[in-house]
Amino acid sequence: MVGKLKQNLLLACLVISSVTVFYLGQHAMECHHRIEERSQPARLENPKATVRAGLDIKANKTFTYHKDMPLIFIGGVPRSGTTLMRAMLDAHPDIRCGEETRVIPRILALKQMWSRSSKEKIRLDEAGVTDEVLDSAMQAFLLEVIVKHGEPAPYLCNKDPFALKSLTYLARLFPNAKFLLMVRDGRASVHSMISRKVTIAGFDLNSYRDCLTKWNRAIETMYNQCMEVGYKKCMLVHYEQLVLHPERWMRTLLKFLHIPWNHSVLHHEEMIGKAGGVSLSKVERSTDQVIKPVNVGALSKWVGKIPPDVLQDMAVIAPMLAKLGYDPYANPPNYGKPDPKILENTRRVYKGEFQLPDFLKEKPQTEQVE
């Protein structure tokens, strides 16, 4: 009896010991696997990994964002109507643009600088920082900024005027993106930046000749890249025609973007400061203008302001004027006849019916565009 009891106790101890050894062995293996996993570089399960999931509370929808989504980029030389364009798109319930990020053109310019320097290119390649690595990092950075600096929406757009100096590169990073290149009479753009003291890197605001020369160089760079990616990806939008005939141009533009028509794009001024509407910056120079409905008040303000010697040499100083369809010697120019509604809007603007709302009243800083 005692012998049988000892035998049972011995068997029980053996079973317990076996289970304990098995458990400890399994635990050790799990720890080893976890250590190995942590030592491996992080891998994305999906090459189209979502940067952000945004929730539209009102519509009870969740949106996911990735590099293959149909992003919209608005650009051009500053003072060419880029803010008006983004405000009109922002009024659409399915589109969110938001204020200028300012960081996007700077990081793109940095990437261009690295690419142009053969010595720097060799150094980066030797360090394993290849074009593929940089492009992947740029995709993630740009998308993160575009997505997270505003509210979620089915369609996202970015408006940083000089970002389109890297238009072909952006088209490669985001294969389904569309580009809107805002074009304006260079004489009007330059007069606006000089009279409103909008400092732009490289532009001498004391010289119409210098500013027109720099305007010509900048718009030529963006225009050539727009032509390179083709009409299916890039659309030229003449500021003058947009303000003269907004409905015609917005219908054409939304069709180009494959976004359904919505009448609210013609009344962006009614959506300012509203949820899901147009968010404006207190420090951007165009804010006091886009609070007003589309009007023709700014079209010919440059007439009589440009020095005679510059006017005489205009075709040589700014050959892109003629290429874009402007008469370099027309003074004043004839941009066309506005729609009746625009004439009414302009009359109301001149009467002073539209004033800067209190929540936007803050003295603007000196704005510099790079």
UniProtKB/Swiss-Prot annotation:
Membrane topology, as annotated, equals: Single-pass type II membrane protein
- Post-translational modification summary for this protein: N-glycosylated.
Q: Which residues bind 3'-phosphoadenylyl sulfate?
A: 79-83, 184, 192, 196, 239, 286-295, 301
Q: What is this protein called?
A: Protein-tyrosine sulfotransferase 1
Q: Which organism is it from?
A: Mus musculus
Question: Which Pfam families does this one have?
Answer: Sulfotransfer_3 (PF13469)
Quaternary state and partners of this protein? Homodimer. Can also form heterodimers with TPST2.
Biological-process GO terms, alphabetical? post-translational protein modification
